[in-house]
């Protein structure tokens, strides 16, 4: 009897990313993941794009689901609900994250028997990949994470993580916007006591225009969100 392959789903929220979406999808190393015994599925969540993002994603071989109500966190939740049971990986649609490294991340995930793996972009920034404002904000949020939750996490804002879908039922995820990335790490690694690890990655300069128009405002909203969670959770 042929052993059934495990499933790994790469969930990619996308809003008007026609310049980068094909490059992002093609970076997923499906052949290498097949050799590791996984059926690799790319799931693009189109978050109300007004350009050709969804059509290009389908042509590039991705499954596409539509989430017309905009919000980074909302798009991710839609992707999680649509993904099959197994392992989920997240990444942005702007070609910043090293999707070619998924096999090595998966090996670390399996070898360490993890429930949740997150990544540290600050360990390998390409020139121009992150503004000084964003770097400062990330460091402030990392300090807040250590103080409030005793989690030694260098980059709590990273958008590339890997986790078992079956942990989602225990997580209280309230944000439908940018703070979801930080919130899911706190929920998994602190409140749910998942086995977790943070590993360094290379982070590239994005293709196309950023959707993050006011980094300080977004960072403040994130900080308030996690502080409130610490007080009322």
Predicted segments, located by residue:
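Cell-envelope/extracellular polymer assembly enzymes that use nucleotide-activated donors
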Residues: 7-9, 41, 183
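Donor nucleotide-sugar binding loop of glycosyltransferases
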Residues: 17-20, 49, 72, 98
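Short, well-formed alpha-helical segments that are part of the catalytic scaffolds
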Residues: 17-33
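A conserved acidic beta->alpha catalytic loop
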Residues: 46-54
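Acceptor/aglycone-binding surface of glycosyltransferases and processive sugar-polymer synthases
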Residues: 68-70, 74-82, 99-178, 205-223, ...
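Short aromatic/hydrophobic "clamp" motif used to bind/position activated sugar donors
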Residues: 88
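The conserved acidic donor/metal-binding loop of glycosyltransferases
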Residues: 92-97
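Catalytic donor-sugar/metal-binding loop of nucleotide-sugar-dependent glycosyltransferases
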Residues: 151-152, 173-176, 186-203
């Amino acid at each position: 009897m042929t052993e059934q392959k495990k499933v790994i789903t790469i969930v990619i929220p996308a809003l008007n990313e026609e310049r980068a979406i094909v490059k992002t999808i093609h970076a997923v190393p499906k052949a290498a993941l097949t050799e590791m015994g996984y059926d690799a599925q790319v799931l693009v969540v189109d978050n109300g794009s007004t350009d050709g993002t969804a059509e290009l994603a389908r042509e590039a071989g991705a499954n596409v689901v539509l989430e017309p109500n905009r919000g980074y966190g909302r798009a991710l939740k839609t992707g999680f609900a649509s993904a099959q049971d197994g392992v989920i990986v997240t990444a942005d649609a702007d070609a910043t994250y090293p999707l070619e490294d998924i096999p090595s991340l998966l090996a670390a995930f399996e070898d360490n028997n993890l429930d949740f793996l997150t990544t540290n972009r600050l360990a390998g920034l390409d020139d121009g990949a992150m503004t000084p404002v964003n770097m400062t904000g990330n460091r402030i949020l990392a300090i807040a994470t250590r103080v409030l939750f005793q989690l030694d996490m260098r980059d709590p804002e990273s958008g590339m993580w890997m986790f078992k879908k079956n942990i989602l039922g225990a997580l209280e995820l309230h944000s439908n916007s940018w703070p979801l990335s930080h919130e899911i790490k706190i929920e998994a690694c602190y409140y749910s006591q998942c086995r977790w690890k943070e590993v360094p990655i290379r982070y590239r300069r994005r293709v196309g225009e950023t959707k993050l128009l006011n980094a300080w405002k977004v960072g403040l909203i994130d900080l308030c969100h996690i502080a409130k969670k610490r007080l009322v959770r």
